[in-house]
Amino acid sequence: MGANISGGSPEFDRNDDVYSRKLRLVDLPENCVALIMTRLDPPEICRLARLNRMFRRASSADFIWESKLPANYRVIAHKVFDEITLTKLIKKDLYAKLSQPNLFDDGTKELWIDKNTGRLCLSISSKALRITGIDDRRYWSHIPTDESRFQSAAYVQQIWWFEVGGEFEIQFPSGTYSLFFRIQLGKTSKRLGRRICNSEHIHGWDIKPVRFQLATSDNQQAVSLCYLNNNPGSWSHYHVGDFKVTNPDVSTGIKFSMTQIDCTHTKGGLCIDSVLILPKECAKEVIGSQ
């Protein structure tokens, strides 16, 4: 006769004068429960861990959480943690830490692991980008804002030659990734607790499109042309393109840019917050939460 697994109280059923006990999940050995947990998603594991002490102990097994981490998690973790910290952390705690945004490179970049896909997410501050003319305060300035992960955005008041670029290299977990620029027309601030947008410098973005571009070290390329016509004071994510990673053991280098270098007219009134690199499957969800 087959055994039924149940989380409730023990039950006995009469069947042809033979009593058969229904097996409860709590009756299983701790190592069996841990094996079952490897088949569950992290939120489900955490819910089970709250049921009793045995489940809580089982949920801390290293092999459970190592199966939820990317295969190359050590490379990713070394970006944000030193060797001593990594040695002390059990895999459950390491997963918890990597699932939250972690700043690195002097606070100009942030990475985390997406809980649904186990893939890498990256955010790169405007301060880590190459911006032509950024040191000339007649054109550019870094403005404080609590609407940025990095508490700062680059603002161009007016310029003829608009050119912003950057690059990054790491061993990405396998999968397809999307790259976005997070930008806003106008400059927002707060007055008497209310959010207001200064749009007086917005001009030139409707004359010629901005060219967004990315290229990878394995010769993948993407180009898109977009007029910047989103509503002033509203952050928008402009999709540059996608790239695929098939070998997580090899570093993938990415170069990206947004340019508008037609010098027949000026353009201005634009905030650049960051560049986002996200697993394609969860990009909409992550962007929607910002």
UniProtKB/Swiss-Prot annotation:
Database matches in InterPro entries: F-box-like_dom_sf, F-box_dom, PP2-like
The keyword Nucleus belongs to this UniProt entry's keyword annotation: yes
Example GO BP: protein ubiquitination
Pathway the protein acts in: Protein modification; protein ubiquitination
Domain F-box: 21-67
Keyword Acetylation: no
Location in or out of the cell: Nucleus
GO cellular component: nucleus
Main location: nucleus
UniProt entry keywords in alphabetical sequence: Nucleus, Ubl conjugation pathway
Domain notes: The F-box is necessary for the interaction with ASK proteins.
Subunit field text: Part of a SCF (ASK-cullin-F-box) protein ligase complex. Interacts with SKP1A/ASK1, SKP1B/ASK2, ASK5, ASK11 and ASK13.
PANTHER family in alphabetical order: F-BOX PROTEIN PP2-A13, F-BOX PROTEIN PP2-A15
Function in brief: Component of SCF(ASK-cullin-F-box) E3 ubiquitin ligase complexes, which may mediate the ubiquitination and subsequent proteasomal degradation of target proteins.
The protein, known as: F-box protein PP2-A13
Annotated source species: Arabidopsis thaliana
